[in-house]
Amino acid sequence: MEKVIRRALISVFHKEGLADILALLHKEGVEFVSTGGTSTFIESLGYPTVAVEDLTRYPSMLGGRVKTLHPAIQGGILARRSHEVDQQEVKEYGLSLIDLVIVDLYPFEATVASGASEEDIIEKIDIGGISLIRGAAKNYEDVVIIPSQADYAALQSILEYRGAKTMLEERRHFARRAFAVSSGYDSAIFRWFDGGEATALRLTADQAQPLRYGENPHQKGIFFGDLSRYFTQLHGKELSYNNLQDIEAAVTLIQDFDAPTFAILKHNNACGCASRPTLIEAWKDALAGDPISAFGGVLIANRPIDKETAQEIDKLFMEVLIAPGFAPEALDILKSKKNRILLEQKSPIHSDWSYRSMLGGVLAQECDQAVETTAEMRCVTKVAPTDRELHDLVFATKLVKHSKSNAIVLAKGDQLIASGVGQTSRVDALKQAIEKAGHFGFDLHGAVLSSDAFFPFDDCVTLAAEAGITVIAQPGGSVRDADSIAAADKLGVAMVMTGVRHFKH
């Protein structure tokens, strides 16, 4: 059903991008109704406007808190054109019908993020704008609602193609967008008022990105969010559901490291990681940790990729490479494979909470942001680790924190030697790690072990000592801690307890 735009109400906080739309509407003979600063802006472009006050016969009140909250405005928006009683009341009360509403809301979230005072934040809670958006969206059969700058381009395309005429499906599209904007806005306000109490959960995302499929080809997949806030994709195919999971795991892991570090991940677990003075050294030693699992993996570095490192990386088949930058020559090399995904990370990603849908609800927890240092490592055995061994324990504990439980990490000299992850038995996780280390020719004498949770029995201590490992880190907290400590003392193993468990499921 086609509708003609004859009168537009325009009240916006941001004026950018509005001039082109105004020019097209004016060309079609559309009358402009506006408020305050928006009216001044429109008139500065040479277009006449009707002030909202001329329709309401009331001035802007209460310091601008009340402008459009009036039957003369809301009635002109909500009146149903095909409804006989509505049209009789339009004539009776002398209402001016409004066919298009362009409005954006006060920048509430930006004001909160700026650290503004509570008084300033309260004043950025939009009342009139929300009412205009909801009213116009409710009456989408007759009215077009443009609720944000993000919708200007779509409206401009319609005006250029068809003039001041819109179709029902277009108006319904804008109405859906309007309720997305209003619900997101109200959720942001609720979260601010709720603070840290978490009395209810309101999650919103302004963008939905369809994926090729979900975790498996028979599952549908969608990403809700805006990846462009953090990444620029420089090359490669579209990101998949599994890519995104590995990217999340990779980014959260690498952010715990300060020295030049390279990590390789498969199925959310690190299969290679090393910190070195140069990035190419870090890459070579990360790959050496498990060159078989690295095939088809997700790679991440915390330093820009140079030409020399790119030449080495190019020898490996991989899905994704993430780095804070790429030298031009490095990009030329890495772009040789058309499907290889290259992501430039623009800024760190810090989340306070993580969420998982479960049992018809949502399970939420604070993100695990604990990073143990040597100061938190309490020696509980007769033999104490050396400073070098303590340094390696910190490295290993950072990795075990990001590994699926039950998890054991073996490390030496800032290099991941092997890991056992996702095991139902902790001793099996250690057996897996020892076997992998031997398979790739690593000498475990001088290596350290970090466990994501306590040892329920002393069997892991015995097995580690038999393999040549003489330094262990674990959280402690088992009723049998004394057994593990006694076994360590008997075998000459140094053990520290961190007091922090790192389960990850």
Predicted regions and their residues:
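Cysteine/selenocysteine-centered motifs that mediate thiol-based redox chemistry or coordinate metal-sulfur cofactors
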Residues: 299-300, 306-315, 440-481
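C-terminal binding/interaction regions
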Residues: 318-341, 463-503
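Active-site loops and adjacent core secondary-structure elements that bind or stabilize anionic groups
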Residues: 150-367, 389-398, 405-407
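Active-site/ligand-binding-proximal alpha/beta "capping" segment
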Residues: 81-137, 378-387
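Glycine- and Gly-Pro-enriched alpha-helical subdomains that act as flexible
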Residues: 271-291, 409, 413-461
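Glycine-rich nucleotide/cofactor/substrate-binding loop typically near the N-terminus or early
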Residues: 37-108, 200
